[in-house]
Amino acid sequence: MSSLGGGSQDAGGSSSSSTNGSGGSGSSGPKAGAADKSAVVAAATPASVADDTPPPERRNKSGIISEPLNKSLRRSRPLSHYSSFGSSGGSGGGSMMGGESADKATAAAAAASLLANGHDLAAAMAVDKSNPTSKHKSGAVASLLSKAERATELAAEGQLTLQQFAQSTEMLKRVVQEHLPLMSEAGAGLPDMEAVAGAEALNGQSDFPYLGAFPINPGLFIMTPAGVFLAESALHMAGLAEYPMQGELASAISSGKKKRKRCGMCAPCRRRINCEQCSSCRNRKTGHQICKFRKCEELKKKPSAALEKVMLPTGAAFRWFQ
């Protein structure tokens, strides 16, 4: 009985010990799990606390705080914080924050360099404005030289024009002295010339306003860069106009049988169209005969009439030119 009791006790002891061991192991298991959970929480707590802490203030060179304008963006977290778990998420968030800070630093450095370049450019422009280069100086000198040359050319042209005007005035005086009739006893001549000149000035403006006192047509003078010349044919016509019978008188004295010419100043001479009604126009057999309405009045007179000197008022011939 004693042996059986001892064996039962031993078995009970072993069972109790086994139960105690199992109980001990069971009790030690929850403790270890709690310790592991606390370690995980402790490991995760610093990361969350680090994320919740506000970022340090960043100031630029001027002392202005560079922070987001919206207050809700001050504690913003990267996307990796919500998509990844554990330490891998923490390390990814740290790398993202490091990349953002590096980008911000790079942008700040670029802005500073641009600002410095802008200051340098402004200083260079100020220097260019204050101190003009030799190219600008040479351009200004060239423009001044061109202006001076132009002024000298204008002065030379004005002097040449004045010389031509003086020459024309002298020639006019000489022509007037040669072709105007002398003062007669009856008082005809210069006063008559002044009266005719005044009447012409009232009727129309003269091409030469300074020479209105001279009854000489401006077409008699040819003005060229080389000088002022007098047209011989116009002067000859003007002389015949002033003394219409003097030319025929000279021709009659020199050669009595010389063919007479048309005066070119009367109304029949100025007519350019035949009437086609007179006998000369109807009879073509007498082709050498001119239209009766175009026959010169001076040619109708007898040759002996050419010896009579007829004086016309001074300046009357020049109405035909105008």
UniProtKB/Swiss-Prot annotation:
Zn(2+) 1 binds at residues 263, 266, 269, 296. Residues 1-100 are annotated as: Disordered. Residues 1-10, 87-97 have a biased composition (Gly residues). A motif (Nuclear localization signal) lies at residues 257-262. It holds the Pfam family zf-CXXC. Zn(2+) 2 binds at residues 275, 278, 281, 291. Residues 11-20, 28-52 have a biased composition (Low complexity). One of its GO terms (biological process) is negative regulation of transcription by RNA polymerase II. Disulfide bonds: none annotated. Keywords: Cytoplasm, DNA-binding, Metal-binding, Nucleus, Phosphoprotein, Zinc, Zinc-finger. The modification Phosphothreonine is found at residue 53. PROSITE patterns: ZF_CXXC. A zinc finger (CXXC-type) spans 256-297. It is found in: Nucleus; Cytoplasm. GO terms for cellular component: cytosol; nucleoplasm. GO terms for molecular function: DNA-binding transcription factor binding; methyl-CpG binding; sequence-specific DNA binding; zinc ion binding. May indirectly participate in activation of the NF-kappa-B and MAPK pathways. Acts as a mediator of BMP4-mediated modulation of canonical Wnt signaling activity in neural stem cells. Required for DNA damage-induced ATM phosphorylation, p53 activation and cell cycle arrest. Involved in myelopoiesis. Binds to the oxygen responsive element of COX4I2 and represses its transcription under hypoxia conditions (4% oxygen), as well as normoxia conditions (20% oxygen). May repress COX4I2 transactivation induced by CHCHD2 and RBPJ. Interacts with DVL1. Interacts with RBPJ. The CXXC zinc finger mediates binding to CpG-DNA. This is CXXC-type zinc finger protein 5. It comes from Pongo abelii. The gene is CXXC5.
